[in-house]
UniProtKB/Swiss-Prot annotation:
Disulfide-bond pairs as recorded: none
Gene that specifies this protein: rbfA
Biological role: One of several proteins that assist in the late maturation steps of the functional core of the 30S ribosomal subunit. Associates with free 30S ribosomal subunits (but not with 30S subunits that are part of 70S ribosomes or polysomes). Required for efficient processing of 16S rRNA. May interact with the 5'-terminal helix region of 16S rRNA.
Compartments, as annotated in UniProt: Cytoplasm
Biased composition (Basic and acidic residues): 120-130
Subunit: Monomer. Binds 30S ribosomal subunits, but not 50S ribosomal subunits or 70S ribosomes.
Annotated protein name in UniProt: Ribosome-binding factor A
Compositional bias (Acidic residues): 131-142
Highest classification ranks of the organism: Bacteria, Pseudomonadati, Pseudomonadota, Alphaproteobacteria, Rhodospirillales
Keywords: Cytoplasm, Ribosome biogenesis
A Pfam family hit: RBFA
Stretches the record annotates as Disordered: 120-142
């Protein structure tokens, strides 16, 4: 979310979650004919819907890792099929246009975790001063 942007409304969150569930169900059934999607385990981690509910960004990650580019291309090619299936599962006036994007939050979390567990950071954490060693407001440090 960019600076100054309004947080999503309850309706956006609810519709996003309904879409995430519906897309995950369609992917789980594996009815795709696209060779890049056949036999691939794909997780839909989040769906962000625009305020007017006309566009939805679908965040996906392949289970077991691997190259996500062919999966994104396959999902883009299967967009019409997905929208048709979603229209049968979710009651909306119009199914949003779907945009697919790799979810990098797991990679970011893993990178942060490895940084926190690095020997240098561990040393700093283990040798951090205790709370009672910090001067308080009434203590001028003398």
């Amino acid at each position: 979310m960019s600076r100054g942007a309004k947080p999503p409304s309850q309706r956006q969150l609810r519709v996003g979650e309904e879409l995430r569930h519906a897309i995950a169900m369609v992917i789980e059934r594996g009815e795709f004919r696209d060779p890049d999607l056949l036999g691939r385990a794909i997780t839909v981690t989040e769906v962000r819907v625009s305020p007017d509910l006309r566009n939805a960004t679908v965040f996906v990650v392949p289970l077991g890792g691997g190259d996500v580019a062919p999966i994104l291309a396959g999902l883009k090619r299967a967009k019409a099929f997905l929208r048709h299936e979603i229209s049968r599962m979710v009651e909306l006036r119009a199914v949003p246009d779907l945009w697919f994007q790799e979810d990098t939050t797991f990679d970011t979390a893993s990178r942060i975790d490895s940084i926190l567990n690095s020997p240098e950071v561990r040393r700093d954490i283990d040798h951090a001063p205790a709370e009672d060693e910090f001067p308080t407001d009434g203590d001028d440090g003398q």
